[in-house]
Amino acid sequence: MLHLHILSWVLAIILFIATYLNISKNQGGTPYFKPLHMVLRLFMLLTLISGFWILIQSFMNGGANHMLLTLKMLCGVAVVGLMEVSIAKRKRHEQSHTMFWITIALIIITMVLGVILPLGPISKLFGIG
């Protein structure tokens, strides 16, 4: 399940950037915008479902840092929401650069939290998790 989660958020980030850049400031969405946006939503849903499943498994196993897990879950949900908001703002021709960079910053924070959690590579490297 962890590999599915990692694959889905990597593809979601790539699709988010592609979708965001496929909206022209003057003309609106390109012909590729709608399919990209639909596939992005699919991968965001897959990311949320797999992340929630990993959260449930970690809570059931015990010994995990529940505070960090819950914080990462909240950051993940916020990232999905901010992705949708920044794309919607750009589509409506509103100022969206600030929202885009806030989304990128929150993606980085969420990734750092995922790296230091018990199933992350840092914990595996040092045998913590």
From Swiss-Prot:
Compartment list: Cell membrane
GO CC terms, sorted: plasma membrane
The keyword Signal appears for this protein: no
Principal cellular location given in the protein's record: membrane
Transcription regulation listed as a keyword: no
Pfam families from the UniProt entry: DUF1516 (PF07457)
TM ranges: 1-21, 36-56, 67-87, 99-119
Keywords: Cell membrane, Membrane, Transmembrane, Transmembrane helix
Membrane-protein topology: Multi-pass membrane protein
Stated family: Belongs to the UPF0344 family.
Protein name: UPF0344 protein SAR0931
Lineage: Bacteria, Bacillati, Bacillota, Bacilli, Bacillales
